[in-house]
């Protein structure tokens, strides 16, 4: 699909960038190219590597992993609300060991298996966790905008001109040019309270295309594929 169509076929919607230390465990025989590689992440994403990859059922499953558990209290309501909507849609969230993530990755949403994976090494700061959960949750909502989460397509939700310039510039400095439209609005959502929550609720209700006007090219694609009249 061409970039101008504002639909992106991809296997991975990558998360925030940050330097990553290396880990090791001897029993991941499915991984042939070492830890902290795309190969290692792929093994996790398709659920062939599950050691130290734990499903998150509430914020406490994450906050209890760290000494500063009480510092997570202010984000509990929004986090748990997003998690609930993700689960309603069919998306699971996992907290995973750093060895499964390539260098510069804090988290990932997988558009094929529809799961979110959070890098345990960096989730000890509540604001980082919340930004990442919103960011990857927005990618899930983009998946929904493209017709259904049961495909490997994502579509932008907001008109590009509505995205504040600061987030577009940040995306341009961080991601390949072809990914900027999707990542710019995900950066925006990552730092905006309830923006992702609202989109996930819309997806769960089945009102995505009435709550948010599809872009012209997305609308054309949705009509061609029978999602809207």
Where are these regions (language model features)?
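Bacterial N-terminal signal peptides
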Residues: 11-19
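Short pre-active-site segment immediately N-terminal to the catalytic Zn-binding motif
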Residues: 116-133
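Cleavable N-terminal signal peptides
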Residues: 13-14, 24, 132
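Metalloprotease/metallohydrolase-associated module, dominated by Zn2+-dependent proteases
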Residues: 151-229
């Amino acid at each position: 699909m061409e970039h101008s169509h504002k639909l992106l076929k991809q296997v991975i919607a990558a998360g925030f960038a940050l330097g990553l230390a290396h880990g090791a465990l001897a029993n991941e025989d499915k991984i042939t190219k070492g830890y902290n590689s795309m190969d290692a992440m792929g093994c996790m994403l398709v659920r062939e590597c599950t050691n130290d990859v734990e499903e998150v059922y509430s914020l406490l499953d994450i906050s209890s992993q760290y000494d500063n558990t009480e510092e997570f209290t202010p984000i509990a309501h929004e986090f748990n609300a997003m998690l609930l909507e993700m689960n309603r849609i069919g998306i699971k969230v996992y907290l995973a060991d750093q060895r499964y993530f390539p260098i510069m990755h804090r988290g990932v949403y997988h558009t094929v298996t529809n799961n979110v994976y959070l890098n345990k090494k960096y989730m000890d700061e509540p604001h980082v966790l919340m930004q990442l959960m919103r960011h990857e949750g927005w990618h899930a909502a983009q998946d929904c905008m493209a017709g259904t989460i049961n495909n490997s397509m994502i579509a932008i939700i907001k008109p590009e001109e509505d995205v504040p310039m600061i987030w577009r510039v940040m995306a341009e400095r961080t991601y390949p040019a072809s990914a900027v439209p999707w990542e710019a609005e995900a950066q925006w959502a990552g730092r905006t309270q309830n923006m992702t929550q609202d989109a996930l609720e819309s997806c769960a209700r089945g009102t995505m295309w009435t709550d948010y006007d599809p872009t012209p090219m997305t609308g054309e694609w949705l009509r061609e594929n029978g999602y809207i009249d």
